[in-house]
Amino acid sequence: MDQYSLGDEGALPSEMHLPSFSESQGLNCSDTLNRDLGPNTRGFLYAGLSGLDPDPSLPTPDMSSEVLEDNLDTLSLYSGKDSDSVKLLEEYADSESQASLQDLGLGVLKAKEADEGGRATSGSARKGKRQHSSPQNPLLDCSLCGKVFSSASSLSKHYLTHSQERKHVCKICSKAFKRQDHLTGHMLTHQKTKPFVCIEQGCSKSYCDYRSLRRHYEVHHGLCILKEAPPEEEACGDSPHAHESAGQPPPSSLRSLVPPEARSPGSLLPHRDLLRRIVSSIVHQKTPSPGPAPAGASDSEGRNTACPCPASSGSSSCTPAGPHAAPAALDTELPEEPCLPQKEPATDVFTAPNSRAAENGAPDPPEPEPDTALLQARSTAECWPEGGSVPACLPLFRGQTVPASSQPSSHSFQWLRNLPGCPKSKGNNVFVVHKPSAVPSREGSESGPGPSSGSPSEESPPGPGGGLEDALPFPAALLRVPAEAPSDPRSASGEDDPCAPKKVKVDCDSFLCQNPGEPGLQEAQKAGGLPADASPLFRQLFLKSQEPLVSHEQMQVFQMITKSQRIFSHAQVAAVSSQLPAPEGKPAALRPLQGPWPQQPPPLAPAVDSLHAGPGNPEAEGSPARRRKTTPGVPREASPGSTRRDAKGGLKVAAVPTPLAAPSLDPSRNPDISSLAKQLRSSKGTLDLEDIFPSTGQRQTQLGGEEPPGASLPGKQAPAENGAASRITKGEKGPACSRGGGYRLLGNPRAPRFSGFRKEKAKMDMCCAASPSQVAMASFSSAGPPADPSKSKLTIFSRIQGGNIYRLPHPVKEENVAGRGNQQNGSPTDWTKPRSTFVCKNCSQMFYTEKGLSSHMCFHSDQWPSPRGKQEPQVFGTEFCKPLRQVLRPEGDRHSPPGTKKPLDPTAAAPLVVPQSIPVVPVTRHIGSMAMGQEKDGEERDSKESSQQRKRKKRPPPSTAGEPGPAGCHQSRLRSPMFLVDCLLKGLFQCSPYTPPPMLSPIREGSGVYFNTLCSTSTQASPDQLISSMLDQVDGSFGICVVKDDTKISIEPHINIGSRFQAEIPELQERSLAGTDEHVASLVWKPWGDMMISSETQDRVTELCNVACSSVMPGGGTNLELALHCLHEAQGNVQVALETLLLRGPHKPRTHLLADYRYTGSDVWTPIEKRLFKKAFYAHKKDFYLIHKMIQTKTVAQCVEYYYIWKKMIKFDCGRAPGLEKRVKREPEEVERTEEKVPCSPRERPSHHPTPKLKTKSYRRESILSSSPNAGSKRTPELLGSAESQGIFPCRECERVFDKIKSRNAHMKRHRLQDHVEPIIRVKWPVKPFQLKEEELGADIGPLQW
């Protein structure tokens, strides 16, 4: 090997040699797989080759100095763990694989130890574009710590780690973060849901974000997920630079699953392209394949010489030169035939069938496929498009031919096949890892070199369990059994394959373009299942990163799940294959598997999507080829001989075309397919499922005109063989289905990336429920027409979850759409899960609770549900949850012919989607036709109506009050809220008849403003009358009370007219007659005599009123009105009025106008009634209804009156009453202290000994009027003034002394009169009931006397 130096641009000087391997050091891929080769790849770092110098201690291989410069993509491989030689090739290498490296001219890569601090790492470069560390793009190092990064964006993000500024603050908990994405991930912790669930057996932990889940896996399950740089946003195949950059494909990421002990702080995964080239070179060195085809090869042979070279060129092992490229790698001129430009991102699919398990007769347990996005599209990095030069790659260099000796026939390591990508899909490369038996056969490789002739495999007895078909999302054309490889190139390629010649040139249309008659994937599947020990290499070394919108953390988590569970489910296969954009014009998705898979283990119960090899169905159902290449107006080609596999693992031949097959195998004949794909790809963000599951209403039939039982459309509830989604709909739940069986919504490769695994959490765990805050925020979405898929935007709920929430389409019927070839509105009901999920028919918002949807509907005030149910909320899990919703019925019946429509049931009622406390009143339909939980009508209804243009709904007329409720009272006619939501009333809405709208519930029990509603008895209702045909109390989740009568009640707004509502106005008369007109009212009081002018008379009248309000009067203490009436009858004579009150009583004849007049306080309360009132008052406070029920002899009005009279006469506080006894005990001591505080002269002190008495806080004037004889007189003003001057403040009324003036002023309020009435009752509320003696004494006096 020549000495070379690529310059000093790189920040990390390194040494690299490619010495030859000895025969004993050959890499054995089977051992590699068995020994977990993949986890050790994380120990390698990357650095530019600009500073590489040869290592003099290593032998120089026979290789030119420009090899690495041209073919290693200017990247070198370092060991980040122990700085040894390349671990990938040395640690797990054996002699045979080392010899193969030596034959290929690939020596041992010697890496220099990385600088301290991990200068060669680019661990922070996880987001943004990764640039090549080439002399044109030198590595960028951190000026603070010296770490090396391949892009400026990675370096800028790394500098944040050195900064202490945290400008992104959480508004909820005020926690600050340096980066916005960290804050976004932190916000997930404030949700009430934990969608990231550990699916290890026996572990039920769940977390809010993927970081916590990853940490959980590392700590508890010993699994470690590496972070990586996400795939860069690459240009589509139609961009001009896609062809120019064929020699240097963009780097792509590689994820690995390693034990915690294998991690190193600054390590980064090895470059995937480099590793793939190296291993592909090794494999194809060992793979027996024919030599280069002669220049004059026939069309059929040229078609089959797609991969005559043993090594892969670029990222594809079968990458022939384009029509404009020099065929140096093949040393032959390949036929040039124009093909369509690339339209879809490339996709790498990897398979690792193991024949050993099949040979042993034991089925290998299936392994969960990587995340649904794991096999996402990739762009130009994966294949070399048409017109690009052949990228020279190890070990096939420009101008070199591979000698036959470099292809040994005997080998014991697994061979890997890197099939080229389709030119229109930018390299759908497929890795196939297969371990043949010890004695491989060469006759297949010697026979006609078909598209997969370079990847021979051996046929083994099929395993009884789930084969590789359960796990591999591509047909068997990739796995050619050597013994069955057709020798006839024409038969191998197929006569009806017009694109066969292109398989040689432009990546040979690699993705699953298999020909009729070729052995399908079943032969390879019969060779055995995927071994558990092959998973590390399968997942870590060759798994490509996804299209730019894919979250790389999700891939890591799913790889971790894959390793821990080792279960491949059909649902996951379908989900993954749905992410594989197939080449336009290629045969579309595979048919689903027939049969319910009775032999599968429980985890595989929901797995339905399997892979059936065949010319017409080379792709898995649900794949983009099947989802996107759906042009109903274009005839499909159905190829006979479709190889299918039954549930027992055997082969099953059925001439069944794909339901959504491509129009033709020749893309040139269907140019609108690529335009359709481009249109779909141009949509921003996430596409609605209607973009991905076009339910066209057309069902492809066989050539003979029959429709197979399994050929049902997506969106059709069919038996288990019709798709994973239909099985999921039927409730067959499984771990893989519930955790990883979702479909990834494809987006624009150029669309902005969203970081974090939370973008994919809905796909990871479709059972996750929305938190109440999410439902509340999402409920504010405005109503509107169906969102345009090309302008689809993320809802609030999806933004919270990172932008990848399922935006379900409206339940539409697509017969008319199929006629127009419109693919934008599909019905994805076959994709549902057995969990109740509700979708707003107006805005496609998804809700996990019925209450969330019902509350959300109240915000669509201008677009309420139609009474005919044209727009129904979609219900997930039709077998499980049908609460007040109609189950969305897929198009037609399962047995109906294609395109048949079911007429809409005119009596099918709409779902009740109303907020709480809103009445529902139907108009024209009977109660039996309502939609309160009638699933039958809902299931029979198709989704046709919502495809029509939505019309604004009119507000329905308000409902009416019904008959008396359970309590015996008429239900109120109050209405709430402003709109009376009633989807059962002709779809018409009216405003509330009352202004302003009442706030109380319209159906509440009890009286209201509009109490007794008069019911009309007319049999025919006028336009303003409604039939109140209500149901019983509806679902408790709604909280709706409904009326149960069928009376016809008019609730039209009107003005109440009549003597009951308006006063009668007398006729107008002359003013002169007013003086002679006698007043109809009786005069009961007027000032007599000189009462208006004489002050003495006024004083006498005032004294009479005071006496009448005192306890002297038997009638009560506040009968001022009675005193005035008596004074009026006495014509102003105060003495006569007083005698009337005291002696005779105010007795009036029956003819008197006031004979039946009831005076306040005139009721007589017996002692028993008083005692009961006190007990009731202490027990119920001011609830006079309960007091009345306890007394039973007094009405509520009498109890209220007694309370207020009592309150005026006695100042009591029932809350402080229990402390009276303590107060009584303290008052004697207060008296003593008061006497000590009262200042007096020394000579007065001996003669003054006041008698101690209880100083209650009642209105006691007796303390002044009737003090003991030996008590001194009141303090003189001088004495009081001197006392105040000394800081002592005595009361002038009761001689209490206070230390503060404020205390005395507050105390003086007790001595004030209430309403000019002298408080006479001076007895405080006793704690104990009154003694009978006291009651007897008080029974003779008035009701307020004690």
UniProtKB/Swiss-Prot annotation:
Its main location: nucleus. It is found in: Nucleus. Residues 934-948, 1234-1247 have a biased composition (Basic and acidic residues). One of its GO terms (molecular function) is zinc ion binding. Residues 1053-1145 form the ELM2 domain. Residues 1-34, 113-136, 235-271, 283-328, 437-472, 578-744, 931-971, 1224-1281 are annotated as: Disordered. It comes from the Eukaryota. GO terms for cellular component: histone deacetylase complex; nucleus; transcription regulator complex. Residues 294-323, 440-458 have a biased composition (Low complexity). The keyword Isomerase does not apply. A zinc finger (C2H2-type) spans 140-162, 168-190, 196-220, 838-860, 1289-1311. Residues 21-32, 671-685, 1264-1273 have a biased composition (Polar residues). Residues 1160-1211 form the SANT domain. InterPro entries: ELM2_dom, Homeodomain-like_sf, SANT/Myb, SANT_dom, Trans_reg/Corepressor, Znf_C2H2_sf, Znf_C2H2_type. Keywords: Activator, Developmental protein, Differentiation, Meiosis, Metal-binding, Nucleus, Repeat, Repressor, Spermatogenesis, Transcription, Transcription regulation, Zinc, Zinc-finger. SMART domains: ELM2, SANT, ZnF_C2H2. Pfam families: ELM2, zf-C2H2, zf-C2H2_6. GO terms for biological process: cell differentiation; male meiotic nuclear division; negative regulation of DNA-templated transcription; positive regulation of DNA-templated transcription; regulation of DNA-templated transcription; regulation of transcription by RNA polymerase II; spermatogenesis. Residues 1248-1258 have a biased composition (Basic residues). Transcription regulator which is essential for male fertility and for the completion of meiotic prophase in spermatocytes. Regulates progression of the pachytene stage of meiotic prophase by activating the expression of genes involved in meiosis during spermatogenesis. Maintains the repression of pre-pachytene transcriptional programs, including meiotic double-strand breaks (DSB) formation genes in pachytene spermatocytes and suppresses aberrant DSB formation after mid-pachytene, thus ensuring meiosis progression. Interacts with DNTTIP1. Identified in a complex with KCDT19, HDAC1 and HSPA2. Component of a histone deacetylase complex containing DNTTIP1, ZNF541, HDAC1 and HDAC2. Identified in a complex with HDAC1, HDAC2, DNTTIP1 and KCTD19. This is Zinc finger protein 541. It comes from Homo sapiens (Human). The gene is ZNF541.
